[in-house]
């Protein structure tokens, strides 16, 4: 059993998620597709804009609408956030994410729904995660390379085949001699927008310092 979101490959020394996370993600299999889609929208919205008060209100509304215990729902969302963050950190492909969902006991249709939603929000999630990392960690190194999309590219649509994209790798200092690699895949307009946001954040930090 190989869980790709943990950075595992096909060797024999694969890490396994803890039982709590297995239970939290696996609980998604109890939802209808409509409920699952609604919950995923809530989770991805929070991961992108990170408004805790709004999330708590949405949890209460979802709990009341579908008769699900709020604490149970919070645990499910916590597990999903861990799963999606780790998937983005390890630059997981859509197929590998779908395979992980199946190993969490979601059926094929549910797994496809989760991976499709993840694909739709991948760029925004990655940008949000990198932005948060840059606010609390020193960047030790930055590497990038350009590529041209093909019809099989994970995060492109068929009408963007042949366009240029940029793969970005940041090496962050986590403290205590610990380093972390953060990966992103962006189109050029998205990269320039990301760069503009980082320059604005840098200017704000310099102002307050």
Swiss-Prot record:
GO molecular function terms attached to this record: NF-kappaB binding
One BP annotation, GO: tumor necrosis factor-mediated signaling pathway
Stored InterPro entries: COMM, COMMD4/6/7/8, COMMD7
Top-rank taxon, per record: Eukaryota
Listed Pfam families: COMM_domain, COMM_HN
Cross-referenced PROSITE patterns: COMM
Residue ranges of domain COMM in the record: 138-209
Subunit structure: Component of the commander complex consisting of the CCC subcomplex and the retriever subcomplex. Component of the CCC subcomplex.
Family under the similarity heading: Belongs to the COMM domain-containing protein 7 family.
Xref: PANTHER family: COMM DOMAIN-CONTAINING PROTEIN 4-8 FAMILY MEMBER, COMM DOMAIN-CONTAINING PROTEIN 7
Record function comment: Scaffold protein in the commander complex that is essential for endosomal recycling of transmembrane cargos; the commander complex is composed of the CCC subcomplex and the retriever subcomplex.
Protein name in the entry: COMM domain-containing protein 7
Species whose genome carries this gene: Dictyostelium discoideum (Social amoeba)
């Amino acid at each position: 059993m190989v869980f790709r979101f943990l950075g595992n490959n096909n060797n024999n020394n694969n890490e396994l998620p803890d039982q709590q996370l297995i239970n939290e993600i696996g609980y998604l299999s109890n939802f209808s597709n409509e409920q699952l889609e609604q919950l995923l929208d809530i989770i991805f919205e929070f991961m992108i804009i990170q408004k805790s008060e709004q999330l708590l209100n949405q949890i209460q509304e979802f709990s009341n609408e579908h008769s699900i215990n709020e604490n149970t729902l919070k645990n499910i969302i916590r597990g999903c956030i861990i799963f999606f963050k780790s998937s983005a950190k390890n630059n997981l492909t859509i197929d590998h994410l779908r395979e992980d969902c199946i190993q969490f006991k979601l059926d094929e249709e549910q797994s496809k729904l989760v991976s499709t939603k993840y694909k739709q929000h991948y760029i925004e999630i990655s940008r949000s995660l990198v932005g948060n990392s840059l606010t609390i960690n020193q960047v030790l190194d930055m590497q990038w390379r350009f590529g041209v999309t093909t019809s099989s590219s994970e995060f492109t649509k068929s009408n963007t085949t042949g366009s240029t994209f940029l793969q970005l790798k940041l090496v962050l200092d986590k403290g205590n001699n610990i380093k972390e690699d953060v990966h992103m895949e962006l189109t050029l307009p998205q990269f320039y927008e990301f760069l503009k946001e980082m320059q604005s954040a840098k200017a704000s930090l310099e102002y307050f310092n």
